[in-house]
């Protein structure tokens, strides 16, 4: 056990939308410390979303994140030689980071030409409750539902 609780690092809002959420997303998107590249990918993706839908890109991004945010997850626990998948509620900060990481991960796996195009298409799909990221959330919830019987085991 640690002696003190870890301090949360302050997150500065991004320059264009003045949003901490965007900064957190860009920090997750960043590879090898290249923040300016990550920012341009994100802004390009948001612009593409706005152009294709005719609505505010940031609002669609927020809607997409809300749609792919999980409420419960399963965690493995050994009880008497057997490993059980136990459903657990997720705290808010972890929900958000899981949603962001899923959105970025499944965007990277898509087959479009540029990362900004992949991200834009995955955001639009998630906003419409489709796509690989939304499927991942549904699968997570399905696993938790299937293992509801073991929810009396606690950590």
Residue ranges and their predicted role:
Residues 1-32, 36, 43-155:
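Strongly charged
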């Amino acid at each position: 056990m640690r002696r003190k609780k870890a301090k949360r690092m302050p997150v500065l809002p991004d320059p264009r939308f003045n949003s901490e959420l965007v900064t957190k997303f860009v920090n997750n998107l960043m590879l090898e410390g290249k923040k300016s590249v990550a920012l341009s990918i994100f802004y390009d993706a948001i612009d593409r979303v706005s152009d294709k839908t005719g609505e505010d890109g940031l609002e669609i991004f927020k809607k997409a994140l809300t749609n792919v945010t999980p409420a419960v997850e399963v965690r493995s626990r050994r009880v008497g030689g057997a490993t059980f998948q136990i459903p657990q509620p997720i705290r808010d900060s972890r929900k958000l980071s899981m949603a962001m990481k899923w959105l970025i991960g499944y965007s990277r796996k898509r087959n479009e030409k540029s990362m900004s195009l992949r991200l834009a298409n995955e955001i639009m799909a998630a906003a419409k409750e489709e796509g690989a990221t939304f499927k991942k959330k549904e699968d997570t919830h399905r696993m938790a539902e299937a293992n509801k019987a073991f929810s009396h085991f606690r950590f």
